[in-house]
Amino acid sequence: NFLQILIITKLANGEVLAPKHKDHPLSGDWVGHRECHIQPDWLLVYRYDNDVLVLALSRTGTHSDLFGL
């Protein structure tokens, strides 16, 4: 998907995502990960390793797919 690749490219380049993507840190079992919205109910969970441009993509899916909500 073009939009997913665009967002991953921005994250890999250290760019800040537009506010519509609601990029934010996660808590609980997901501490150390971040989540952004590719589309309103299509999420990307990711994390950076040691503040370097190593992007570890964790999961993508809807809120229900990822968190059972």
Language-model regions: role of each:
Residues 1-40, 49-55, 63-69:
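Basic, Lys/Arg-enriched alpha-helical interface segments
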